[in-house]
Amino acid sequence: IRDFNKENFELRKSRLEKMVKDLNLDHNETVAEISIKDQYYNMKEMIDPQYYIVELAREAMLSCNIGPVVVPVRGGTDGSRLSYMGLPCPNIFGGGHNFHGEYEYIPTKSMESACRVIVAIISKVYLNSSQNG
């Protein structure tokens, strides 16, 4: 279960628990069980306080002649998990197609562009750190 909104996320979990409870009541026995373990959360609340990292990525993309497209992600990524472990990791580049499918792929040009953006981010961070002491 994933959602952009924490309240809706909790509501979805509650609905599932109620469905299982109602199903068991309808059958007058335990025919279904549910166990919910949270794995991913919306990383927005971890990224927003450190939003300069998104701006840094946006500037790096522009310097590489790549038009940044900011699209919310509902979690389900390593970046979401890492963000909640204290390392804010917005998803800044995809480029892949047919994710999680038999025909998943990423074009070489997309990988090259991702590398250029990463180098641009590193350069900007290095320049800022050397200018600030």
Per-segment meaning from a language model:
Residues 1-133:
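Metal-dependent amide/peptide-bond hydrolase catalytic core
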